[in-house]
Amino acid sequence: MPLNVSFTNRNYDLDYDSVQPYFYCDEEENFYQQQQQSELQPPAPSEDIWKKFELLPTPPLSPSRRSGLCSPSYVAVTPFSLRGDNDGGGGSFSTADQLEMVTELLGGDMVNQSFICDPDDETFIKNIIIQDCMWSGFSAAAKLVSEKLASYQAARKDSGSPNPARGHSVCSTSSLYLQDLSAAASECIDPSVVFPYPLNDGSSPKSCPSQDSSAFSPSSDSLLSSTESSPQGSPEPLVLHEETPPTTSSDSEEEQEDEEEIDVVSVEKRQAPGKRSESGSPSAGGHSKPPHSPLVLKRCHVSTHQHNYAAPPSTRKDYPAAKRVKLDSVRVLRQISNNRKCTSPRSSDTEENDKRRTHNVLERQRRNELKRSFFALRDQIPELENNEKAPKVVILKKATAYILSVQAEEQKLISEEDLLRKRREQLKHKLEQLRNSCA
């Protein structure tokens, strides 16, 4: 799609100047010139997207993984000395000069978010395209950094001397700058996992050039700590690996905080500091490690092992020998008591079953006897004598009425018996009188 330019003169040089800010690797281009040309031409979509949609500014960029500086195969084994004199190892920059360079380069946020690298490198173009596609606006920061880097490189060329120890000092400074950067980069996700083409083209370890590439740590406190830790009198070799960077105070605090947190990767994460402390110790001969760290791969992939919820919870803990003996004795006693408890419930259950069985037998006998007594009572009642289906309530009512009638009859019979007895007594007395009169 052609770009609509508001120029009246159709000059190809002017057209190229208007489109020139869209090219990435132009070290002589001024970043602030785009603001002056914004009235003459429309801005780039990647630069104007936040103003167009009114979104928040981009988050800080993650540290990039360049093949020239912080590739996993890069190893720097150089003596380091901060003395500016000729006796202490040939250092060309003093501590004040180095700190001034770091503070000037770390002054702006745009420089803090970018990583200084060789602009002629092929991976630099790839990384610029990646960062611009992902974060939108990385190219402008890279231009500003490349301009400042070019000025410092020119200053180094002017103040250059044929002293061969100067290259070693510059390599040592850049290796010091790479310490915290490699420590931060080992915690990041490897871009080769995400992107199809390899970012680290050069697998062989490269020497540290003083003009093409230089890396600065994102904080000056780590530089001070590293310079104070190294002795000034005797040069000490520094071995820098990407996977196992030397642990600083901030790294140890972050590792302690990571150990306190519980996550999916906590087991692998806690095993890493021990390995770092072993490999981060200074040694004379440094060997390159495989390009990809297993820690990075573990951070990329979440563990797929799931907890077996059907299994009983494991309460196993490691105790000293004395505590283990006590716990074993306690366990034996508990097993004995549990066995006793298990035997007593069994005996009690059998006793209860026997009691229930005898109770059922007795209850059945009582019901049979009650039924027989009801049948006998029914047979005594003349009204229900032939009624085999008479209910118990009817039997009881009829029996009560029959008993009352029988009692009334009994009273009548008793009264009649008394009358008959009196009559008999009277007749006996009259018979005796007749016998006495006849005699």
UniProtKB/Swiss-Prot annotation:
Residues 266-278 have a biased composition (Basic and acidic residues). One of its GO terms (biological process) is positive regulation of transcription by RNA polymerase II. GO terms for molecular function: DNA binding; DNA-binding transcription factor activity, RNA polymerase II-specific; E-box binding; protein dimerization activity; protein-containing complex binding. Phosphorylated by PRKDC. Phosphorylation at Ser-329 by PIM2 leads to the stabilization of MYC. Phosphorylation at Ser-62 by CDK2 prevents Ras-induced senescence. Phosphorylated at Ser-62 by DYRK2; this primes the protein for subsequent phosphorylation by GSK3B at Thr-58. Phosphorylation at Thr-58 and Ser-62 by GSK3 is required for ubiquitination and degradation by the proteasome. Dephosphorylation at multiple sites by the PNUTS-PP1 complex promotes MYC stability by preventing ubiquitination by the SCF(FBXW7) complex. Ubiquitinated by the SCF(FBXW7) complex when phosphorylated at Thr-58 and Ser-62, leading to its degradation by the proteasome. Ubiquitination is counteracted by USP28 in the nucleoplasm and USP36 in the nucleolus, both interacting with of FBXW7, leading to its deubiquitination and preventing degradation. Also polyubiquitinated by the DCX(TRPC4AP) complex. Ubiquitinated by UBR5 when not forming a heterodimer with another bHLH protein, leading to its degradation: UBR5 recognizes and binds a degron that is only available upon heterodimer dissociation. Keywords: Acetylation, Activator, Chromosome, Cytoplasm, DNA-binding, Glycoprotein, Isopeptide bond, Nucleus, Phosphoprotein, Proto-oncogene, Transcription, Transcription regulation, Ubl conjugation. There is a cross-link at K52, K143, K148, K298 (Glycyl lysine isopeptide (Lys-Gly) (interchain with G-Cter in SUMO2)). Residues 251-263 have a biased composition (Acidic residues). The modification N6-acetyllysine is found at K143, K148, K157, K275, K317, K323, K371. The modification Phosphothreonine is found at T8, T58, T315. Residues 335-347 have a biased composition (Polar residues). Glycans are attached at T58. Transcription factor that binds DNA in a non-specific manner, yet also specifically recognizes the core sequence 5'-CAC[GA]TG-3'. Activates the transcription of growth-related genes. Binds to the VEGFA promoter, promoting VEGFA production and subsequent sprouting angiogenesis. Regulator of somatic reprogramming, controls self-renewal of embryonic stem cells. Functions with TAF6L to activate target gene expression through RNA polymerase II pause release. The 9aaTAD motif is a transactivation domain present in a large number of yeast and animal transcription factors. Efficient DNA binding requires dimerization with another bHLH protein. Binds DNA as a heterodimer with MAX. Interacts with TAF1C and SPAG9. Interacts with PARP10. Interacts with KDM5A and KDM5B. Interacts (when phosphorylated at Thr-58 and Ser-62) with FBXW7. Interacts with PIM2. Interacts with RIOX1. The heterodimer MYC:MAX interacts with ABI1; the interaction may enhance MYC:MAX transcriptional activity. Interacts with TRIM6. Interacts with NPM1; the binary complex is recruited to the promoter of MYC target genes and enhances their transcription. This is Myc proto-oncogene protein. The gene is MYC.
